[in-house]
Swiss-Prot record:
This is ATP synthase subunit beta. F-type ATPases have 2 components, CF(1) - the catalytic core - and CF(0) - the membrane proton channel. CF(1) has five subunits: alpha(3), beta(3), gamma(1), delta(1), epsilon(1). CF(0) has three main subunits: a(1), b(2) and c(9-12). The alpha and beta chains form an alternating ring which encloses part of the gamma chain. CF(1) is attached to CF(0) by a central stalk formed by the gamma and epsilon chains, while a peripheral stalk is formed by the delta and b chains. Pfam families: ATP-synt_ab, ATP-synt_ab_N, ATP-synt_VA_C. It is a peripheral membrane protein. One of its GO terms (cellular component) is plasma membrane. One of its GO terms (molecular function) is ATP hydrolysis activity. Produces ATP from ADP in the presence of a proton gradient across the membrane. The catalytic sites are hosted primarily by the beta subunits. Keywords: ATP synthesis, ATP-binding, Cell membrane, CF(1), Hydrogen ion transport, Ion transport, Membrane, Nucleotide-binding, Translocase, Transport. The gene is atpD. It comes from Lactobacillus johnsonii (strain CNCM I-12250 / La1 / NCC 533). It is an enzyme of class 7 (translocase).
Amino acid sequence: MSKGEIVQVIGPVVDVEFPLDKDLPDINNALRVTNNNGDTLVLEVTLELGDGVLRTISMESTDGLRRGMEVEDTGAPISVPVGKDTLGRVFNVLGDPIDGGPALGKDVKREGIHKEAPKYDELSTSEEILETGIKVIDLLEPYVRGGKVGLFGGAGVGKTTIIQELIHNIAQEHGGISVFTGVGERTREGNDLYFEMKASGVLSKTAMVFGQMNEPPGARMRVALTGLTIAEYFRDVEGLDVLLFIDNIFRFTQAGSEVSALLGRMPSAVGYQPTLATEMGQLQERITSTKKGSITSIQAVYVPADDYTDPAPATTFAHLDATTNLERRLVEQGIYPAVDPLESTSSALDPEIVGEEHYEVAVKVQHILQRYQELQDIISVLGMDELSDDEKLIVERARKIQFFLSQNFFVAEQFTGIPGSYVPIKETIKGFKMIIDGKLDDLPEDAFRNVGPIEDVIKQAEKMGVTPKNPEAKAILEAK
């Protein structure tokens, strides 16, 4: 392989000169350099400057590098371990284990992180609903197996908590292979997640890849591709249905913006890189279902300053089948998960996919909540007394629906001391149908807050000294 030498180091950007009489390394090739401490650093070729000089981005800290050091071309892109050996382990962007466990053997298969998206005739579409056990998601923005989902929200509204709950619920119920990719998020959260998964017994079916906040932009930009490469192998070679969790896809964009500035490119709107749509497309087009297997992707998307028109979340929107929008207003009201039932969407909310009953209940719930939102202006100015009897009934039912959309999470039990609940879709539909049909009008709205299925509401109401009058609700109470 050809060898060159470092001619310039500016932070994570390293310029390397190769002899003109030798073949130059290709774009995206990995280069190796050994610093004074004997540590091997990996650089990725990103630009050709001319006269044999290549501009590269380092995947690790460039401390200890200096001009004149020898650099070797590996002849291929960064490659990472794939297959069964990755399960139960934690890796960095280069595929090196960082969990303190044994090193992987030399015979472990490795694949390059840069690939083409599957061809059009290889793609497969699925209309099977993926049950999450979270009421607001299953009812109003159902997720499709093999689809792409975005969890949108500003800082501190609960994106990571929902991702952790989905990992818990789906791993317990679905039992398939999961790949978790931490992109530019807090190391503490990754550590907590690792030990939680170890304790719950799902770690043996999960591969974890981390490129956290403290790492150079090159690592944060490429770590999503590392996780995706591991997931693609399970899909294409093992023929499995894989769950790919990415937290947070915005940090991928942010790292790309940093790299773009370091490479000297002219920024575009709001300071983002001019290649934003291309980079996002190259990643998202690989996350898909083929005739061999599927990748169901759930991605947290940080929304800067709660501004959904920001280019980063706006570019991500175009690639998703379902969106779960988290709203700070609901956090302030103490409703968790703080999912906005009117702004969240799903292409699967269709009577031919979810069934007539599910669709009708979901549409009626949205209609009642929409009407309540319209009436809030009148209530805030004139008060409840100015509403007609029908409007008062809508407000009461809407508040019950709003509270019933909340529930306790398993992953939050260590903080709240309250056990979480998994609610099957059938139970979710039954509960909301009873509310919109007026069968629970006599129960206090506080009984609907942070509960699981409708049985919990009726039990909660009885503790408050209220027995339901409706025969169906009474029968549920007696059955319990």
